[in-house]
Amino acid sequence: MLGAVKMEGHEATDWSSYYGEAEAYSSVGNMNAGLSMNPMNTYMSMSAMRTSANMTASSMNMSYVNTGMSPSLTGMSPGTGAMTGMGTGVPSMASHLSPSMIPMSAQTTAMNALAPYTNINSMSPIYGQSNINRSRDPKTYRRSYTHAKPPYSYISLITMAIQQSPNKMLTLSEIYQWIMDLFPFYRQNQQRWQNSIRHSLSFNDCFLKVPRSPDKPGKGSFWTLHPDSGNMFENGCYLRRQKRFKCEKKPSLREGGGKKLSEGASSVGSAANSSSESSVGNESPHSSSSPCQEQKRSLVDMKSSQGLSPKHATSPASQAQHLLSQHHSVLSHEAQSHLKPEHHYSFNHPFSINNLMSSEQQHHHHHHHNHHHHHKMDLKAYEQVMHYSSYGSPMAGSLAMSTVTNKSGLESSPITSDTSYYQGGYSRPIMNSS
């Protein structure tokens, strides 16, 4: 066998060097090195430590001799000559193998076609690709992680931006820019989240719009935090807002005048009702009560007895009239209803779905709030739509049916004020939309 291999090799020095290196391997490995005289073949045989793998490697060499690899084989004549030499080498090699290996040598010819591709693929391309993928994974992970959506609500983002500004005031464009500078995530889909920022500014009473003063020329009004908003977030962390403050924020919800109205009305009193509506942004910040909820509750109770009864009676009797007079009644009702803040908190938009869901939310917030909310719905022309009032709860249905009769009870509770306020701000559109 060695003689035949040497004849093919033509160079004893090369053979001896290969033979010395392959000494550690089985006779098949030695045969491989001698047959191919090709560094690539030795690499393949070394990568496959088992004798069967070595045999496939040798057969692989044989199959490649005819193809493009033959020119690179040193000392082997390209073309069929090398193939014939190898053919002679394989049988002789099989004779030297142990009996158990002999059948494998017979199979080498059948393996010629498949072995080269399987071995080559397994040797470099797959491993190389896997290494490349492994090196890329951390980068892609880091990249996606740094651009992940921040765990802050839009209200938190706006509050952070305003609080970190020197003047505690920012224009809308400055708020956008601050968010984009701090959070790369918001550098994409700007139109989408900027709409949400505008909604948050408009629909949360904790944000006040401050018109530009003559000494500060420029475009756009300033936005600042309500002086009574206090610490809106738990433990100074922007991840979670305190429910209490949410109610505070929302008491004057959006309604233009109604928003700051409720706060202004509660602090100023019934006299401020008409002015508070117009004073929406400016008056409410100054006149709004810092203990919004508590002050509003007391005011609500007081005012519910004062102007609530006349206006409340009108609202259930004729919702259209109540809608017209809602602004006045709304002012008093807003001040009267501490529920109004929570109601704002519970609903994001004055639509029937939110009102329906408010029953559950109110259960969580305050039990009597359920009554308020349901009654609110009832006062709002939801009485006409029976399933709305009944949906909230049987209590809601009863309240709706007996809005006029239970007027005394309604007056005692901020429910009526809430309902009238809500009507004042939204009753007509809400009724239409619902």
UniProtKB/Swiss-Prot annotation:
UniProt GO molecular function: DNA-binding transcription factor activity, RNA polymerase II-specific; protein domain specific binding; RNA polymerase II cis-regulatory region sequence-specific DNA binding; sequence-specific DNA binding
Low complexity bias (residue ranges): 263-291, 317-333
Membrane in keyword set: no
Tissue: At gastrula stage, expressed in both the anterior and posterior endoderm, with endodermal expression persisting into early tailbud stages. Expression is absent in gastrula stage ectoderm. During tailbud stages, expressed in the pharyngeal region, the neural floor plate, the midbrain, hindbrain and in cranial neural crest cells. Expressed in the foregut of hatching larvae. In tadpoles, expressed in the pharyngeal pouches and in other anterior endodermal regions.
Key words, A-Z: Activator, Developmental protein, DNA-binding, Nucleus, Transcription, Transcription regulation
Localization per Swiss-Prot or TrEMBL: Nucleus
Main localization category: nucleus
Protein name: Forkhead box protein A2-A
Species: Xenopus laevis
Taxonomic lineage of the native organism: Eukaryota, Metazoa, Chordata, Craniata, Vertebrata
UniProt gene name: foxa2-a
